């Protein structure tokens, strides 16, 4: 009887610890929302090819609004919206930027392979116990990369780490042909002033039937410094108006991804990229949005 009571006490204690940990995780994820002055900084570091010459360092910055697009007990969707014209208004003043979804104890991933192909991967439930999968999506809500890891709350720090294969970043998508996979080492950490996306990346050339070839390594530091929400009012107004349209886009992609199979998409149709087609739509053109997404899916 005493043993049973001990097991019951241990079970209750474990459940309470898990719930407390989960609440800290959710708080950390939501701490990334708000209006931010963002600086993007990238520098190539270690060269793996003898005749390779390092490219110039990349630096850029912008105002960015991050908001909870949708939320359920085991999923939080954070939408990023860049402000490209602070004096403008509507969709001409913003870029509907990337999205990060966080799923608790998720077992289903679409892992980037190369080109415009993602492989479906099923993880054992025991391997993701207590973990959160970060699923990153492109400006058109197509998948980009996914990685799973545990939020750590220790010694006054709050951070999450994972690694993931990803397509080329937008800053090099049209200028680089010497590599086709960016292996991202992601570290996201929360501070009182905002948060940081710290990256240790490898630029990889991937070919069928051959081992991956590392071209060069890269260090990335993205600083998200919190500012007054009023500075992002343009993005907030845009999202209030257009969020139903983008919800339709997300749902259309989700329907395809829920099939739990490999995915291939075409980068453009008749030389027009999907995000450009989607940005032309008005807030109530949900049917047209759904049809557009399906047109870009190969299988």
Predicted regions and their residues:
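Bacterial Sec-dependent N-terminal signal peptides
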Residues: 1-23
């Amino acid at each position: 009887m005493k043993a049973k009571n001990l097991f019951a006490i241990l079970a209750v204690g474990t459940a309470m610890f898990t719930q407390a940990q989960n609440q800290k995780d959710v708080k950390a994820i939501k701490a990334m929302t708000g209006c931010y002055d963002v600086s993007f900084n990238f520098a190539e570091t270690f060269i793996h090819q003898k005749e390779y010459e390092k490219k110039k360092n990349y630096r850029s910055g912008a105002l960015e609004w991050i908001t909870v697009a949708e939320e359920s007990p085991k999923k939080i969707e954070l939408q990023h919206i860049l402000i490209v014209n602070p004096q403008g208004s509507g969709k001409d003043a913003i870029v509907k930027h990337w999205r990060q979804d966080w799923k608790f104890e998720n077992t289903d991933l679409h892992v980037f392979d190369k080109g415009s192909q993602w492989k479906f991967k099923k993880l054992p439930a025991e391997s993701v116990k207590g973990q959160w999968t970060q699923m990153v999506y492109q400006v058109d809500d197509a998948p980009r990369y996914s990685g799973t890891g545990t939020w750590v709350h220790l010694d006054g720090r709050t951070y999450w780490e994972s690694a993931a294969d990803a397509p080329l970043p937008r800053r090099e998508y049209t200028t680089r042909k010497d590599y086709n996979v960016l292996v991202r080492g992601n570290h996201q950490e929360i501070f009182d002033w905002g948060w940081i996306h710290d990256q240790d990346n490898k630029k990889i050339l991937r070919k069928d039937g051959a081992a991956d070839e590392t071209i060069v390594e890269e260090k990335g530091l993205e600083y998200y410094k919190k500012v007054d929400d009023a500075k992002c009012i343009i993005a907030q107004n845009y999202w209030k108006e257009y969020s139903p349209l983008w919800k339709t886009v997300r749902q259309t992609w989700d329907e395809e991804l829920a099939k739990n199979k490999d995915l291939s998409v075409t980068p453009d149709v008749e030389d027009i990229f999907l995000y450009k087609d989607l940005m032309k739509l008005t807030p109530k053109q949900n049917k047209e949005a759904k049809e557009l997404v399906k047109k870009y899916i190969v299988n």
